[in-house]
Regions:
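Short helix-capping segments at alpha-helix termini
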Residues: 73-78, 101-103, 132-134, 158-162, ...
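Catalytic alpha/beta core domains of metabolic enzymes, predominantly
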Residues: 132, 143-251
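A general structural signal for well-ordered alpha-helical segments in protein cores
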Residues: 32, 64, 68, 92, ...
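Active-site beta->alpha loop and helix N-cap motifs at the rims of alpha/beta catalytic domains
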Residues: 3-146, 156, 299
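Residues within alpha-helical segments
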Residues: 72, 93, 97-100, 177, ...
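C-terminal alpha-helical cap/extension of soluble enzyme domains
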Residues: 2, 8-9, 14-18, 35, ...
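Short, flexible micro-motifs
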Residues: 15, 49, 54-57, 86, ...
C-alpha cells in the first residue's frame, strides 16, 4: 500500500509580500491582488501575507483578514501562507483559524514575543495554534523577538507535531546542519535574503523571500541554481544581487524593498508609522543598487 505524502506548500520561493498603500495610507487591495498574481506569473511559488514586510503590526483586524482573503482570491489558497503572529496564543490561533477558513495551505508563526518566553511557554504557544488544523511553519527571528528557536527546541516542537518547517532568520547558517541531525523531516526555509546561497547549499527546501517583490525572475533563477548546487550559475548572480539582498536583514528592510519596487515600476509606496522614510544616504544606496540591477537586466 502506498500513501500520498502530505503537501508541503512552503517549499520553493514564497514571497513575504509588501503591501501597497495609497497616499492616504489606505490599503490598496486591487493593487495587492495584482501584485500577488504578478509574483506567481513571474515564477514564484506562493505568497506570505501579513509578515513583517506586509506591515501586519499596523493593520486593523479587518484589514489583516481582508489581505489574506485577497491573496487567496488572487493566486489560490494552496499558494498562500499568512503570518499569524500575535501577542497572545488565543489570538494567534484565531488568525490561523481565519486562514483555514479562507482556504490557505499553511500558516507561519513567530514565538511569543511580548516577553522573553521560556521553552514551556513557546511549546504551549505552538501547540495552541497547531490546534487550528493547518500546518505551522515556525519563524525564528531572535533578533527582533528575543526568543530563540534553537535547533533542540525546534526538534521538540517538530517531534510533538506542532511545526513542520522553520523559517530560519538567525543568520547562523551552522544551525542548518544541527537541525538536520536532530529533526531530519523538519523543512528548513531560508529566512534572510542575504544568506540564500549558504542555506540552500546546506539543504534548505524553500525561501521566504523579500526581494522578489521587486526582482522576482532573477531571485527565482538564483534560488533554483543554488538549491540545485549549480554554484557556477548561482554565485555570479548572488554577487550582483547581494547589495540589495542584504537590506532584508536591516531595520529599514520594508522601506528599502518598497523603494526598489517603485524603481522597477511596481507600486511600493509609503509605509505606515512608526516606520519613517529612508534617510537620503540610505535612499541613495538602495537606488544605486537597484538601478545597477536593472541595468544588468535583472528586473
Amino acid at each position: 500500500m502506498t500513501t500520498t505524502p502530505a503537501p508541503r506548500p512552503w517549499r520553493g520561493v514564497l514571497v513575504a509580500t509588501a503591501l501597497p498603500l495609497d497616499d492616504d495610507l489606505a490599503v490598496n487591495y486591487d493593487r495587492y491582488a495584482e501584485h500577488c498574481a504578478w509574483l506567481v506569473a513571474n515564477g514564484c511559488d506562493g505568497v506570505v501575507p501579513n509578515g513583517s514586510l506586509g506591515e501586519y503590526q499596523v493593520l486593523t483586524p479587518e484589514e489583516r483578514a481582508r489581505v489574506v482573503e485577497t491573496a487567496v482570491a488572487a493566486v489560490g489558497g494552496e499558494r498562500v501562507m499568512p503570518g499569524v503572529a500575535a501577542y497572545g496564543s488565543a489570538e494567534a490561533r484565531r488568525w490561523a483559524e481565519q486562514a483555514r477558513e479562507a482556504g490557505c495551505g499553511a500558516v507561519m508563526l513567530l514565538p511569543p514575543n511580548a516577553y522573553r518566553a521560556d521553552e514551556r511557554a513557546v511549546v504551549a504557544h505552538y501547540a495552541e495554534v497547531a490546534e487550528a488544523g493547518l500546518p505551522v511553519v515556525a519563524y525564528n527571528n531572535p533578533i527582533d523577538t528575543k526568543v530563540d528557536l534553537v535547533p533542540e527546541l525546534l526538534a521538540r516542537l517538530h517531534g510533538e507535531g506542532h511545526v513542520q518547517a522553520v523559517k530560519e532568520f538567525s543568520g547562523d547558517v551552522r544551525r542548518a546542519y544541527r537541525i538536520a541531525e536532530l529533526a531530519p523531516e523538519l523543512d528548513l526555509l531560508i529566512g534572510a535574503d542575504d544568506v540564500l546561497v549558504e542555506l540552500a547549499v546546506a539543504g534548505a527546501k524553500g525561501w521566504v523571500a523579500g526581494y522578489p517583490n521587486a526582482l522576482p525572475r532573477a531571485s527565482v533563477e538564483l534560488y533554483r541554481a543554488a538549491v540545485a548546487g549549480d554554484l557556477a550559475a548561482a554565485l555570479p548572480l548572488y554577487r550582483r544581487l547581494h547589495p540589495l539582498l542584504r537590506w532584508d536583514s536591516r531595520v529599514e528592510f520594508v522601506q528599502a524593498i518598497k523603494l526598489s519596487m517603485d524603481i522597477v515600476g511596481r507600486h511600493g509606496g509609503r509605509c505606515r508609522p512608526p516606520r519613517v522614510p529612508l534617510t537620503p544616504e540610505q535612499e541613495a544606496a538602495v537606488r544605486e543598487a537597484t538601478e545597477r540591477a536593472v541595468a544588468a537586466g535583472l528586473a
